[in-house]
C-alpha cells in the first residue's frame, strides 16, 4: 500500500524543538517577577499569632484585622443559603361566627322558594322538610323575600355563606383554587367569592376586614305591582365536592335584612348543596330523612335485650278471617265441565296446603286427591259430585 503524501502547507505538530524556538521569542525581561521578600514576610503569620488563631474563634472585631493582614487576598464569596420553603397556604380563619338563628323582626322578614320537583332536568330545587336548597354550579337560584311591612328606605339584603358543622364554622367559605382561576367573572365579583347575584348592577361584594368573611349586598327593593314578594337570583360558583374548597362540607346561607346603618332588621338561613343532579340528591336525602324520622324504641334502663315495640295505634287490628270449613255439593252437567271444576278444586286445595292455611285433615285429603284422579273420600270430609247426562232434564 502506498503511504499518503503529506501536504506541505500543513505545519507539523508541536514538539520539543518547536517549543524551544517559541521560548527564544519571549522578551529578555521576565514577565513573572518574584515578589519582594518584604511583601512575603508581611503575608506570613508569626507562630504566636498562628497559635492564637487556631485556639480562638475570630470575633466580629477581628475580621478587619484579618483583612489588613492579607490585603492581597480576595474575599471568598459566601455560599448562597438555601431558600426556606414557602409555608403551605392555610385556610383563613374568622374571628367571629355569625348567628344563624331565625329572626323575623318587627317587619316579619322571611324567605320563600319556588315549588319544584325532583326531576333529573331540574337545576334548582328546595326541600321544605330539610330546609335545604339543591342547585347546580352557576345556575339561577331564586330566593323570595317576604315582609309584613315595608322596611325603611336604604335597607339592604346581605347573603353570606358559613360552614354548618361546628368544627368548621371559623373557616371562611370560598371557592376552590380551580374555580378561582376560571374565566367566568362578570367584572364585579371577586374570583374567590362563592355567592353572586345575577342581574343586579347595584350589587356590592364585601370582604370584612375583621372577620375576613365574604358577603354580597343588594339594596332592598319593594315588590312590584301585582306581586307580594321580592325575588333575588343567586348563583353558587363552586361545587360542594370540590377539593380545596368546600370539600363535601355542608354550608348554610344566611340572608339578613339590614338598614342603611347596618343594623339587623331580620335574619333567616337555609342549607345549600351544589351538585350535578339536584333532583336526585334531594330525593335521596329526603328518603334518608324519613327513615331516620321513624320512631325507634329505647331500651329500659338496665336492660340488655331489645325491647318489644309497643303498639300505640288505637285502631283495632283486623282479625284473620277463619278458614271456611263448610262443604257444598255442586251438580255439574257434562263430563268436560266436571273435569275442569275438579282440577280447579284440587289446585285450590293444594295452594291452601302449601300456604299452611289448611288443617292437617284437609292437607291429607288434597294429597289423596292429587294421587287419585277420581272421586275420593277422606276421614274428615267427603266431596260429592253428581254427573248428569244430556237427557237428565
UniProtKB/Swiss-Prot annotation:
Q: Where is the composition biased (Basic residues)?
A: 365-384
Q: Region (Interaction with HIPK2) spans which residues?
A: 319-360
Q: Where Omega-N-methylarginine occurs, residue numbers?
A: 333
Return the annotated region ranges for Interaction with DNA: 273-280
Site (Interaction with DNA) residue list: 120
Q: Where is this region: Required for interaction with FBXO42?
A: 113-236
The segments labelled Interaction with WWOX in the record are: 66-110
Query: Which parts of the sequence are annotated with region: Interaction with HRMT1L2?
Result: 1-83
Cofactor dependence is on:
Zn(2+)
- The entry's Zn(2+)-binding residues are 176, 179, 238, 242
The subcellular localization recorded is:
Cytoplasm; Nucleus; Nucleus, PML body; Endoplasmic reticulum
Q: Cross-link position, Glycyl lysine isopeptide (Lys-Gly) (interchain with G-Cter in ubiquitin)?
A: 24, 291-292, 351, 357
Q: Which GO terms describe its biological process?
A: cellular senescence; circadian behavior; DNA damage response; entrainment of circadian clock by photoperiod; negative regulation of cell growth; negative regulation of DNA-templated transcription; nucleotide-excision repair; oligodendrocyte apoptotic process
Region: Interaction with AXIN1; residue ranges are 116-292
| Annotated region of DNA binding | 102-292
- Sequence ranges of Pro residues compositional bias: 77-90
Q: Where is this region: Transcription activation (acidic)?
A: 1-44
Q: Which InterPro entries match?
A: p53-like_TF_DNA-bd_sf, p53/RUNT-type_TF_DNA-bd_sf, p53_DNA-bd, p53_TAD2, p53_tetramer_sf, p53_tetrameristn, p53_transactivation_domain, p53_tumour_suppressor
Q: Where is this region: Interaction with CCAR2?
A: 1-320
Provide the residue span(s) of the region labelled Interaction with CARM1: 300-393
Q: Which disease is it linked to?
A: p53 is found in increased amounts in a wide variety of transformed cells. p53 is frequently mutated or inactivated in many types of cancer.
Q: What is known of its domains?
A: The N-terminal and C-terminal disordered regions undergo liquid-liquid phase separation (LLPS) following homotetramerization and activation. Post-translational modifications, such as phosphorylation or lactylation affect the ability to undergo LLPS. The nuclear export signal acts as a transcriptional repression domain. The TADI and TADII motifs (residues 17 to 25 and 48 to 56) correspond both to 9aaTAD motifs which are transactivation domains present in a large number of yeast and animal transcription factors.
Q: Which family does it belong to?
A: Belongs to the p53 family.
Its recorded name reads: Cellular tumor antigen p53
Q: Which organism is it from?
A: Chlorocebus aethiops
Amino acid at each position: 500500500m502506498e503511504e499518503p503524501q503529506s501536504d506541505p502547507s500543513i505545519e507539523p505538530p508541536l514538539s520539543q524543538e518547536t517549543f524551544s524556538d517559541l521560548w527564544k521569542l519571549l522578551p529578555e525581561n521576565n514577565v513573572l517577577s518574584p515578589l519582594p521578600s518584604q511583601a512575603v514576610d508581611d503575608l506570613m503569620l508569626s507562630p504566636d499569632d498562628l497559635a492564637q488563631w487556631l485556639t480562638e474563634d475570630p470575633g466580629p472585631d477581628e475580621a478587619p484585622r484579618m483583612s489588613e493582614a492579607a490585603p492581597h487576598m480576595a474575599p471568598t464569596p459566601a455560599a448562597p443559603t438555601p431558600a426556606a420553603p414557602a409555608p403551605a397556604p392555610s385556610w383563613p380563619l374568622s374571628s367571629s361566627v355569625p348567628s344563624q338563628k331565625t329572626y323575623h323582626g318587627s317587619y316579619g322578614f322571611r324567605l320563600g322558594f319556588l315549588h319544584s320537583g325532583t326531576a333529573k332536568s331540574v337545576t334548582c330545587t328546595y326541600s321544605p322538610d330539610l330546609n335545604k336548597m339543591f342547585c347546580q354550579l352557576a345556575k339561577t337560584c331564586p330566593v323570595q323575600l317576604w315582609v309584613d311591612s315595608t322596611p325603611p328606605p336604604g335597607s339592604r339584603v346581605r347573603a353570606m355563606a358559613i360552614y354548618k358543622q361546628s368544627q368548621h364554622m371559623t373557616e371562611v367559605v370560598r371557592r376552590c383554587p380551580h374555580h378561582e382561576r376560571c374565566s367566568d367573572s362578570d367584572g364585579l365579583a371577586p374570583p374567590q367569592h362563592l355567592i353572586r347575584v345575577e342581574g343586579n348592577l347595584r350589587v356590592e361584594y364585601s370582604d370584612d376586614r375583621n372577620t375576613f368573611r365574604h358577603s354580597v349586598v343588594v339594596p332592598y327593593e319593594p315588590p312590584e305591582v301585582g306581586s307580594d314578594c321580592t325575588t333575588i337570583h343567586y348563583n353558587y360558583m363552586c361545587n360542594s365536592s370540590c377539593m380545596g374548597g368546600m370539600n363535601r362540607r355542608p354550608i348554610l346561607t344566611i340572608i339578613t335584612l339590614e338598614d342603611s346603618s347596618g343594623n339587623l332588621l331580620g335574619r333567616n338561613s337555609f342549607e345549600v348543596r351544589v351538585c350535578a343532579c339536584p333532583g336526585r340528591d334531594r330525593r335521596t336525602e329526603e328518603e334518608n330523612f324519613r327513615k331516620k324520622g321513624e320512631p325507634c324504641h329505647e331500651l329500659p334502663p338496665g336492660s340488655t335485650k331489645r325491647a318489644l315495640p309497643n303498639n300505640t295505634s288505637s285502631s283495632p287490628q283486623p282479625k284473620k278471617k277463619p278458614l271456611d270449613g263448610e262443604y257444598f255439593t255442586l251438580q255439574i252437567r257434562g263430563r268436560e265441565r266436571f273435569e275442569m271444576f275438579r282440577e280447579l278444586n284440587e289446585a285450590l286445595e293444594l295452594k291452601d296446603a302449601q300456604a299452611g292455611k289448611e288443617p292437617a285433615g284437609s292437607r291429607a285429603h288434597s294429597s289423596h286427591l292429587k294421587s287419585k284422579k277420581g272421586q275420593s273420600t277422606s276421614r274428615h270430609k267427603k266431596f260429592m259430585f253428581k254427573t248428569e247426562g244430556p237427557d237428565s232434564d
